[in-house]
């Protein structure tokens, strides 16, 4: 869930009353939100960078509020306040209007070259807007929140906002070779080509995350005004020429991207949130977008639509008994203007342009439940009920865990993700032979693949506890993940049991004895007859030559045990011998 940070005093001023922290927490809960943290800029910096860096930072109290991921209208102070005020019935939901300009309409012309990289664009104008420092900061913050959420880190949509008074329309959205694009980007003092900018921004902590979107494309998108001034090179950076400030009065907003629907939603959210500060409140000046095929369309759409939901459906789904009139009132409090029509059981709901999250009747039912209050819904026994039971595999796992602990082994719980090196190089095998599932864009080198064995996690646990008295006897019973083209997701989980013994001597007899105990618990007798188990000499790159055995049970190989190779011990930063056992638990069900 996205988190919105708002200044407490500014929020209370906008709400028209002061709350205690407990009262505001309760209000958030009633509205379907969560007050995650009460902090300050100074406290945040102090936690992350230390007290020295925090010196001089603001002590203004901040509320960090968790917002549902699909409620884009609550990602800024303006939308949050408006939603809460409507919810508390202090104001009515405003009606957003698109108006045509007194003079010539602003045009954004899309050329056919953009089809190869980011084919869609929409635009609008906020006319005669009045910013303060706090309003301006909120405007910038909303764009960043939208970029991180619905825009999918600018991959689907990128937002550009420009001081219209510094530009001259019509505007052209095209795509050119990087070497042909040259302009002065935001916060720079001279002009650079697009190629130079990409190299510069590779070390920029903020912008480097977006470079991959267009970096390897033959053409880069760019927007010009009629004088050839660059507005932006989406999705990377805006031009410095048209930068907006607190004193900006007319804003040209463009949203470019690969998803037309999301681009329209993003534009609607921005203009509805900040048209409140325009001279004519909640009105947005239209802009015309001309597509490569010659057709044109006017934006923003600011479309209102009607939905019909039966009152008895809402009552049934939520588990309440409310009159249609009361249900309509509840929905109106959730920014969904509603009225009872027809036979008295039908509720007509008007969906405003700010509520792009309302897709189906179930979304309307959910809002009715929130407004009614989850704590007010009476708990009842269902008409039919069943007694839950454990999956056989989980039940067997729990039984084994208790008995492994009784055998003197300590349980460890390690990460399901690990580095390629952990499951391949350190164990003496090639990564291609592991059938590992790879993370496409890992955040750290420690979490690159899903583990194919539990052994590395236990060895790393021992390495982190080398100061503990010997011997160290650890076990883990968890899932590993292996590629499997026969499954719908391309991978399959297997429940493994792994145990290690770390001491001044290898202790193979300890691990062997543990295997015998496990088989006894699983009611698998020794010997090949009658579904028994045997161990046979084997070899493995992770084991010492001649000190490895493969375990066969009920006619199939279920795992290996043995003394680990000195190279494996060294690579995991250990200094003493270690024996291990790892088996697949699944075949014993």
UniProtKB/Swiss-Prot annotation:
EC code(s) of this entry: 6.1.1.20
GO terms of molecular function: ATP binding; magnesium ion binding; phenylalanine-tRNA ligase activity; RNA binding
Cofactor(s) named in the record: Mg(2+)
Broad class of enzyme this protein falls into: ligase
Disease named in the record: Rajab interstitial lung disease with brain calcifications 1: An autosomal recessive, lethal neurodevelopmental disorder characterized by multiple clinical manifestations including intrauterine growth restriction, failure to thrive, developmental delay, hypotonia, interstitial lung disease, and liver dysfunction. Brain imaging shows abnormal periventricular white matter, basal ganglia echogenicity, cerebral volume loss, incomplete closure of the Sylvian fissures, and normal myelination.
PANTHER family per record: PHENYLALANINE--TRNA LIGASE BETA SUBUNIT, PHENYLALANYL-TRNA SYNTHETASE BETA CHAIN AND LEUCINE-RICH REPEAT-CONTAINING PROTEIN 47
Name recorded for this polypeptide: Phenylalanine--tRNA ligase beta subunit
Lineage of the species this protein comes from: Eukaryota, Metazoa, Chordata, Craniata, Vertebrata
Gene giving rise to this polypeptide: FARSB
């Amino acid at each position: 869930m996205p988190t919105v940070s708002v200044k407490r005093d500014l929020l209370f001023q906008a709400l028209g009353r002061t709350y205690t922290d407990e009262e505001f927490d309760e209000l958030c809960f009633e509205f379907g939100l969560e007050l995650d943290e009460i902090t300050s800029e100074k406290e945040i910096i102090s936690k992350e960078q230390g007290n020295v860096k925090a010196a001089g930072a603001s002590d203004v109290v901040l509320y960090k509020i968790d917002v549902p991921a699909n409620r884009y209208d609550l990602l800024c102070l303006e939308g949050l306040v408006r939603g809460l005020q409507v919810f508390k019935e202090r104001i009515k939901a405003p009606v957003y209007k698109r108006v045509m300009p007194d003079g010539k309409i602003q045009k954004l012309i899309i050329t056919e070259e953009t089809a190869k990289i980011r084919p869609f664009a929409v635009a609008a104008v906020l006319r005669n807007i009045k910013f303060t420092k706090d309003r301006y900061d909120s405007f910038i913050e909303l764009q960043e929140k939208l970029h991180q959420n619905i825009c999918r880190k600018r991959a689907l949509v990128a937002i550009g906002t420009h001081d219209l008074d510094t530009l001259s329309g019509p505007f052209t959205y095209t795509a050119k070779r990087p070497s042909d694009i040259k302009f002065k980007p935001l916060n720079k003092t001279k002009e650079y080509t697009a190629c130079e900018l990409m190299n510069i921004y590779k070390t920029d902590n903020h912008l480097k995350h977006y470079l991959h979107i267009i970096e390897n494309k033959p053409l880069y998108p760019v927007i010009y005004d009629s004088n050839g001034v660059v507005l932006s090179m989406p999705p990377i950076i805006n031009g410095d020429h048209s930068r907006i400030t607190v004193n900006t009065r007319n804003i040209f907003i463009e949203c470019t991207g690969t998803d037309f629907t999301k681009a329209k939603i993003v534009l609607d959210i921005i203009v509805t949130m900040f048209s409140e500060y325009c001279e004519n409140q909640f009105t947005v000046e239209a802009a015309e977008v001309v597509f490569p095929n010659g057709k044109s369309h006017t934006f923003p759409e600011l479309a209102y639509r009607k939905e019909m939901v039966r009152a008895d459906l809402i009552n049934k789904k939520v588990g309440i008994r409310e009159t249609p009139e009361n249900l309509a009132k509840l929905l109106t409090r959730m920014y969904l203007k509603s009225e009872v029509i027809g036979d008295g059981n039908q509720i007509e709901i008007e969906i405003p342009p700010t509520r792009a999250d309302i897709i189906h009747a179930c979304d309307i039912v959910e809002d009715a439940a929130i407004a009614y209050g989850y704590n007010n819904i009476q708990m009842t026994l269902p008409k039919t009920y069943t007694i839950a039971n454990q999956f056989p595999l989980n039940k067997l796992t729990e039984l084994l865990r208790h008995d492994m602990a009784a055998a003197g082994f300590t349980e460890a719980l390690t990460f399901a993700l690990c580095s390629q090196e952990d499951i391949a190089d350190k164990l003496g095998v090639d990564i291609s032979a592991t059938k590992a599932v790879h993370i496409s864009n890992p955040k750290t080198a420690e979490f690159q693949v899903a583990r194919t064995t539990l052994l590395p996690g236990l060895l790393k646990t021992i390495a982190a506890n080398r100061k503990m008295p010997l011997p160290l006897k650890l076990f883990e019973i968890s899932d590993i993940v292996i590629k499997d083209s026969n499954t719908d997701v391309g991978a399959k989980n297997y429940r493994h049991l792994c145990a290690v013994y770390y001491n001044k001597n290898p202790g193979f007899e300890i691990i062997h004895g543990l295997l015998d105990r496990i088989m006894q618990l699983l009611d698998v007798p020794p010997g090949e007859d009658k579904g028994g188990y045997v161990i046979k000499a084997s070899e493995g790159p992770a084991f010492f030559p001649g000190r490895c055995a493969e375990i066969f049970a009920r006619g199939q190989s279920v795992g290996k045990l043995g003394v680990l190779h000195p190279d494996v011990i060294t690579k995991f930063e250990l200094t003493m011998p270690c024996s291990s056992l790892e088996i697949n638990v699944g075949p014993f069900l």
